[in-house]
Every structure is written in structure tokens, then in C-alpha cells.
Regions:
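Acidic/glycine-enriched connector segments
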Residues: 2-3, 7-111
């Protein structure tokens, strides 16, 4: 199962295993600070396949992060979204998942934990 792990840059996720479903064999993420970095570190330290989609600024300019987010969710069977309640990028992912009927689990967290 391909599990996208996305979230606000100011957040960190400890014990990602508590959120991942059984059978998760691949982590899909965007390579940014915060949640994406936690996802990368988890995948690498647990021997999971890691697929990262980075924003293509040369191709898409300012809309590159949003285009990247679409690519992430299109390559996932499930999306785990860790949101600080403010981040526009994570909010965009949540809305896109719902409008495309892509399974998404949302965890709203503060920057302090």
C-alpha cells in the first residue's frame, strides 16, 4: 500500500508507526521540512520504499508546490495529513483528496505537539 504522508512544515511526527496502516509498504511525500522530513526518516530507517515528489519551480513557477501535492495524492492509496489548522498546502491536499474520493485521515495538531 502506498501511503502519502503530508503536513505542515512547522510540525513533526514522532512514532509514525502509530498512524500507518498495516501493509503500508511505500511512503509517498514531498521532501519539504517538517512532516515530510519525518516521513523520509521513518521510511529510510524502517526499510520502506520512499517516493518523493519535489516541486518543479522551473516548470510551474509559484504553483509548483500545489502541482506537486496533486502528484503526491494521485500516487497514494491513502493520505495521512498532519495539519496545524493554518497551512494552506495541507488544507489544499485535504480538499483535493475529498473531491477526488482519495482516502484521507486528517490529524489536526498544534506546533507544540
Amino acid at each position: 500500500m502506498r501511503v502519502a504522508v503530508v503536513g505542515s512544515r512547522g510540525l513533526k511526527v514522532e512514532h509514525l508507526e502509530n498512524y500507518l496502516p498495516e501493509g503500508g509498504t511505500e511512503i509517498v511525500s514531498g521532501g519539504a521540512r517538517g512532516v515530510d522530513t519525518c516521513a523520509r526518516e521513518y521510511a529510510l530507517s524502517h526499510g520502506l520504499k520512499l517516493t518523493e515528489f519535489l516541486p518543479e519551480y522551473d516548470k510551474y513557477g509559484r504553483s509548483a508546490p500545489l502541482k506537486r501535492n496533486i502528484t503526491i495524492i494521485e500516487n497514494a492509496d491513502l493520505v495521512l495529513a498532519f495539519w496545524d489548522g493554518v497551512s494552506h498546502g495541507t488544507k489544499f491536499v485535504i480538499k483535493q483528496c475529498k473531491s477526488r474520493s482519495i482516502p484521507v485521515k486528517v490529524f489536526v495538531r498544534s506546533h507544540s505537539g
